[in-house]
Amino acid sequence: MNAQALVLTDNAANKVRQLRDSEGNDDLMLRVYVTGGGCSGFSYGFNFAESVNEDDAEFVNGDVKMLVDSLSYQYLVGSVVDYVEGLEGSRFIVQNPNATTTCGCGSSFSI
């Protein structure tokens, strides 16, 4: 898997650092995944992991790692993971060039 296939922006990396520091756990990594569901067919998911699974691809921004499993990777290749703060609240988002349709909330897509 190409290590440049996904990008974690500086804003997203800074938020992960902030959350990692508040937990007091420097081993936490951001896991991004795709699951079935949502109004457009697929949904993005985010959580924190302390270990790398055998089928994970790793993407790095400074001292922050982002993990993507091999199934999700095929849907996320070329994507940019960012963190935004706005009127709808603060959240991680995925800018996915493979998505042909996205819903208004930005967390569901189709290919």
Curated annotation (Swiss-Prot):
Pfam families: Fe-S_biosyn. Iron-sulfur cluster binds at residues 39, 103, 105. Coiled coil: none annotated. Its cofactor is iron-sulfur cluster. GO terms for molecular function: 2 iron, 2 sulfur cluster binding; 4 iron, 4 sulfur cluster binding; iron ion binding. The keyword RNA-binding does not apply. InterPro entries: FeS_biogenesis, FeS_cluster_insertion, FeS_cluster_insertion_CS, FeS_cluster_insertion_RrpA, HesB-like_dom_sf. Binds 1 iron-sulfur cluster per subunit. The keyword Nuclease does not apply. GO terms for biological process: iron-sulfur cluster assembly. Keywords: Iron, Iron-sulfur, Metal-binding. Homodimer. Required for insertion of 4Fe-4S clusters for at least IspG. Belongs to the HesB/IscA family. This is Iron-sulfur cluster insertion protein ErpA. The lineage of its organism: Bacteria, Pseudomonadati, Pseudomonadota, Gammaproteobacteria, Moraxellales.
